[in-house]
Amino acid sequence: MEIKGRFDHFNFNVLGFEKSIRVYEKALGLKEVRRKTASDGSFILVYMGDGETSFTLELTWLRDRKEPYDLGEGEYHLCLRVPGDYDKVRAFHKEMGCVCYENTDMGLYFICDPDGYWIEILPL
């Protein structure tokens, strides 16, 4: 049996989903493509997409969660390739104050979202 799957989405749990949405819109150009709210208001799922692929980033907000999430020591991250002038994009992210790691020898950097998740930025 050959399974021909494709990636659909990746999830980040967030404390302040409106703030997170604004960061993903401004820093990465993602747009909200879908939202699901529990009938009892206990959670909200917001799916952010790039408009080019069907892959989405699912932001999950849990009403009763008050303390920051423990992201552990796992070195997992998302990576986004950006078109255009890479140096200009990096300067924009530095101006936003969201660059959390930079390795100029390797030609890459990471930004952090409001909950501490890392997103690698590479040229297209």
Label each PLM-derived region with a short phrase.
Residues 1-21, 75-78:
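N-terminal beta-strand motif that seeds the catalytic metal site of vicinal oxygen chelate
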Residues 52-57, 116-120:
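Short, charged/polar, Gly/Pro-enriched secondary-structure boundary elements
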Residues 51-55, 64-66, 85-87:
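Short, charged/polar surface micro-motifs in flexible loops or helix N-caps
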Residues 15-18, 71-118, 123-124:
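Vicinal oxygen chelate
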Residues 6, 44, 53-55, 74-76, ...:
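Residues that flank catalytic or metal-binding motifs in active/ligand-binding sites
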Residues 11-54:
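Core segments of cupin and vicinal oxygen chelate
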